[in-house]
Structure formats: structure tokens, C-alpha cells
UniProtKB/Swiss-Prot annotation:
Keyword field contains Transferase: yes
Name this protein carries in UniProt: S-adenosylmethionine synthase 3
Keyword ATP-binding tagged: yes
Residue numbers binding ATP: 15, 167-169, 235-238, 246, 252-253, 269, 273, 277
This protein's pathway: Amino-acid biosynthesis; S-adenosyl-L-methionine biosynthesis; S-adenosyl-L-methionine from L-methionine: step 1/1
Required cofactor names: Mn(2+); Mg(2+); Co(2+); K(+)
Keywords: ATP-binding, Cobalt, Cytoplasm, Magnesium, Metal-binding, Nucleotide-binding, One-carbon metabolism, Potassium, Transferase
Residues annotated for K(+) binding in this entry: 43
Any GO BP annotation: S-adenosylmethionine biosynthetic process
Catalytic activity: L-methionine + ATP + H2O = S-adenosyl-L-methionine + phosphate + diphosphate
Subunit-level organization: Homotetramer.
GO molecular function, one term: methionine adenosyltransferase activity
Protein location: Cytoplasm
Length: 389
């Protein structure tokens, strides 16, 4: 049998880049909650004892940026310098200006345009992907790596493994076979976990508890065998972590946010951006389109691309590839996609309810993936059944 190996990684919410994504989206949530027409492009960076938020925000909302930064860091678990950051005592720098009037007039006419007239906030191309290899219609490598990271955080916060600290990374290699273009997982080849820990714990205890409390509950036993390789904290020591260990920046984990290296990526990040930014809204609608194609039984695997020009509502192009798994020709699937999905940014915002903030709506997306999540706030995961004519 001809097989191949493919690998996806994830990082959990205490990773410095992911901390920054969550701060940027917490600010977006706060703006949209009070003013759904907020225009937000919020970046965050972090290093030892410092978090800085900067960018362009035009909003009627009254937002305490410093409080949001501290609350977000505290919620992740950064409560003292020795775990990587002290939420209550670190420096918080804010450098936020209004959206450029040039962009405002071109995209939304200073809020005067109707939803169907709103132009894309920038040029760019975005990809959506779906595959029938998991119930989530997501790649198994990505699903397992992401769930391992989420489980690490769970057992840290519920004190099952009190020696854990917030920062951590996971990686999963799966052996696959190609079944006429569809991806069929056979077994998990390698599991890698590197997690921050306190000084009291031994490497043997780390490995034993990670197997018991993190790996065993997440990876189905049918995918494990006696040849599965485990690398558990292979560097030997990971006490210094979070922003103390490495600088963090919004938008540095775009593959973890999406499909773990499968499909394709146009390069635009999601966090801290309101829905006029097609980097985010465009990627969400093409995920819904690709997922709907697979869920409707029209293909076992699907990639959809959309592209935009700044200030122009209609997409420049829409592309579909079913990797030769389509039950009908790709051009017919493309016609169905165009009939069933409105790719104009103003309409995406309405149809996917993307102007609604608050309740951690977007902050939730900023750790453990934007896709394949079972949560009603993830409106782009709703399947539209597509019928071939």
C-alpha cells in the first residue's frame, strides 16, 4: 500500500503569538459589542513584562484598552513574572489611531454605503478547505494537534497537572493513503508535545502525565500502535516561556488558525480585524462554501479560492478544486457555490453575523483554530446543503 506522512502543529493559548491574537480579538469584541459598525485593525506585540496594542480603530465604543489587555493575559494564566508575564504589573502600551480617511471613503463611504455596496477593505486572496476524513470536515493532523493543545490548557487550569505553565506547542504526524484524491488516515506516526512547566517536576513525570492526561483522552486508540513515536518535551527543559521566552506578535500563526498546512493560504491573518477586512470575512465564507460542498456529498475534499480588489464589492474570481473527488464536474460545483454564497463583504458580514461582538465571540477564535469548531458563534461552520440541478 502506497502511503505518505503529513504533519500539522498547534500552539496553545499561552504561546506569545497566540496571546497577541487573543488580545487583538478581545479588543475587536469590545468595539463591536458597543458599535457594530466599528472599523478595527488591531495589532498586538509582547515581550518580557510588556504588551503593546497598536493599529487603526474608528469606533463610537468607549473601550478601556489597558483593562482588556490585562484581563486577557490574566484569563490565559499569566499571573506572575515567573510563568512568563504578570498581567497586573506588566507595562501596557497603546498606540491606536483612526482608520485612514482614504480607506474609509473607498471601502464604506464613511459608513454611507448600503451593505451590498461595501467594498473589500483590501486586495487579497483567501482559501477555504474541507475534507471528509473527520466529522469536523477538517484534516486529522490539524484536529489532533489542536485538541492536544486545548487539553494541555484544560488539565493546567483544572489542576490535574498543577506543574503545567501556560505556554506550549504540539505537533502530530499522520500516515495517510490517497484514495482517488481523498485523504484516508491510517495511523498516528508521531506525537510531539513541548510544554512549559515549573521547576519542581521531573522529565519522567512530565512524559508520564502527558501520556495519561493529554494524549490518551485526545488521540483515538485505533490510530495508535506500538510503532507510534512520542517526543515529550524533547529539549529537556521548558521553564521560561510566554513573552519572557519569546516575543509575540498578532498574525504569526495563520496555518494553525486554518488547516494545518493542508489546502492553501493567501497569507492574510484574522485576529483584530472587523468584517470589512476580507482577510477574515473572505476566508470564513470560503470555508463555509468548501465545507458545504463536502457535507452535501458533492466531493470528498474541496478547496475554494476567492479574490478581491480594495473598494470593489464583487470578488474578482472564485475558484474550486475537488482534487478529482467530485461527484459532478468542478465547473458545476463552482456554479452551485456562486448561486448559494454571496461573496460581497457587506453581505458576508450580514449572512454570517460578523458584526456581533462581545461574549468572547472573536476571542474564542484566536486560540485552537477558527474552523471545525462546534460552537454557534462560529456561524461560518453552518452547512448549506447544495443540490445539483
Amino acid at each position: 500500500m502506497d502511503t505518505f506522512l503529513f504533519t500539522s502543529e498547534s500552539v496553545n493559548e499561552g504561546h506569545p503569538d497566540k496571546l497577541c491574537d487573543q488580545v487583538s480579538d478581545a479588543i475587536l469584541d469590545a468595539c463591536l459589542e458597543q458599535d457594530p459598525e466599528s472599523k478595527v485593525a488591531c495589532e498586538t506585540c509582547s515581550k518580557t513584562n510588556m504588551v503593546m496594542v497598536f493599529g487603526e480603530i474608528t469606533t463610537k465604543a468607549k473601550v478601556d484598552y489597558e483593562k482588556i489587555v490585562r484581563d486577557t493575559c490574566r484569563g490565559i494564566g499569566f499571573v506572575s513574572a515567573d510563568v512568563g508575564l504578570d498581567a497586573d504589573n506588566c507595562k501596557v502600551l497603546v498606540n491606536i489611531e483612526q482608520q485612514s480617511p482614504d480607506i474609509a471613503q473607498g471601502v464604506h463611504g464613511h459608513l454611507s454605503k448600503k451593505p451590498e455596496e461595501i467594498g473589500a477593505g483590501d486586495q487579497g486572496h483567501m482559501f477555504g478547505y474541507a475534507t471528509d476524513e473527520t466529522p469536523e470536515l477538517m484534516p486529522l493532523t490539524h484536529v489532533l494537534a489542536t485538541k492536544l493543545g486545548a487539553k494541555l490548557t484544560e488539565v493546567r487550569k483544572n489542576k490535574t497537572c498543577p506543574w503545567l505553565r501556560p505556554d506550549g506547542k504540539t505537533q502530530v504526524t499522520v500516515e495517510y493513503r490517497n484514495e482517488g484524491g481523498a485523504m484516508v488516515p491510517i495511523r498516528v506516526h508521531t506525537v510531539l508535545i513541548s510544554t512549559q512547566h515549573d521547576e519542581t517536576v521531573t522529565n519522567d513525570q512530565i512524559a508520564k502525565e502527558l501520556r495519561e492526561h493529554v494524549i490518551k483522552p485526545v488521540i483515538p486508540s485505533k490510530f495508535m500502535d506500538d510503532k507510534t513515536i512520542f517526543h515529550l518535551n524533547p529539549s529537556g527543559r521548558f521553564v521560561i516561556g510566554g513573552p519572557h521566552g519569546d516575543a509575540g506578535l498578532t498574525g504569526r500563526k495563520i496555518i494553525i488558525d486554518t488547516y494545518g498546512g493542508w489546502g492553501a493560504h493567501g497569507g492574510g491573518a484574522f485576529s483584530g480585524k472587523d468584517p470589512t477586512k476580507v482577510d477574515r470575512s473572505g476566508a470564513y465564507i470560503v470555508r463555509q462554501a468548501a465545507k458545504s460542498v463536502v457535507a452535501s456529498g458533492l466531493a470528498r475534499r474541496c478547496l475554494v479560492q476567492v479574490s478581491y480588489a480594495i473598494g470593489v464589492p464583487e470578488p474578482l474570481s472564485v475558484f474550486v478544486d475537488t482534487y478529482k473527488t467530485g461527484k459532478i464536474p468542478d465547473k458545476d460545483i463552482l456554479d452551485l457555490i456562486k448561486e448559494n454564497f454571496d461573496f460581497r463583504p457587506g453581505m458576508i458580514a450580514i449572512n454570517l453575523d460578523l458584526k456581533r461582538g462581545g461574549n468572547f465571540r472573536f476571542q474564542k477564535t484566536a486560540a485552537y483554530g477558527h474552523f471545525g469548531r462546534d460552537d454557534p458563534d462560529f456561524t461560518w461552520e453552518t452547512v448549506k446543503l447544495l443540490k445539483k440541478a
